[in-house]
A protein has these predicted regions:
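Conserved PLP-enzyme active-site core in the AAT-like
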Residues: 76-180
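Conserved N-terminal alpha-helix of the aminotransferase class I/II PLP-enzyme fold
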Residues: 1-85, 93, 106-120, 125, ...
């Protein structure tokens, strides 16, 4: 229950917490990607940030173009300040859509990707030493699947899962797929 305080009108927030909560705050800062850039922080603190320079028009254009490309509405397109921010947001959304459901990560993950899942999205099972039909069996067995996460290619092994093989099992369970 650390206090959150708005700083100015630039959508920048400061979290002040006791040293007891510092490890949790640091883990959030380190793994989620939801942090302000040093350039934005400097401009905000000095009062030199221009609201028109915050990119609202550019974000609207990007949302509109992505929505048209994927045949969805612009409201369905979520933009994040960083790749890790997007991974955090996708995992959080998966947890809200399928609370308590099983989560699986296929192939070797980037450390922070796995940490986001473990720390902020619940328990996740990591499978790296199997492939193809074995992945299908892992997905099909057990509790209903909430989300499957993978990286293409995996880092550092540069492997890619066989989506043609696993997607029918994921769809059958109603699970979400998150691909980085």
């Amino acid at each position: 229950n650390a206090p959150v305080e708005a700083f100015g009108s630039c959508d920048v927030h400061i979290v002040i917490c006791s040293s007891d909560h510092a490890p949790t705050a640091k883990a959030f800062w380190q793994h989620t990607g939801l942090v302000v850039s040093s350039r934005r922080a400097r401009s905000t603190l000095s009062g030199t940030i221009n609201q028109d320079d915050l990119g609202a028009d550019a974000r609207r254009t990007i949302r509109d173009r992505l929505a048209a490309f994927y045949s969805v509405t612009a409201g369905d397109v979520l933009l994040f300040p960083s790749g890790m921010g997007a991974i955090f947001g996708a995992n959080r959304l998966a947890s809200e859509i399928h609370p308590g459901r099983r989560r699986v990560h296929l192939e070797f993950p980037f450390l922070d990707t796995l940490k986001v899942q473990q720390e902020f999205a619940g328990d996740v099972s990591l499978y790296t030493a199997v492939g193809g039909d074995d992945f299908v069996q892992l997905i099909s067995a057990g509790e209903p699947l909430g989300a499957l996460m993978t990286e293409i290619p995996s880092n550092p092994l540069l492997k890619t899962i066989d989506f043609d093989k696993i997607m029918p099992a994921v769809r059958h369970q109603g699970g979400l797929v998150i691909v980085d």
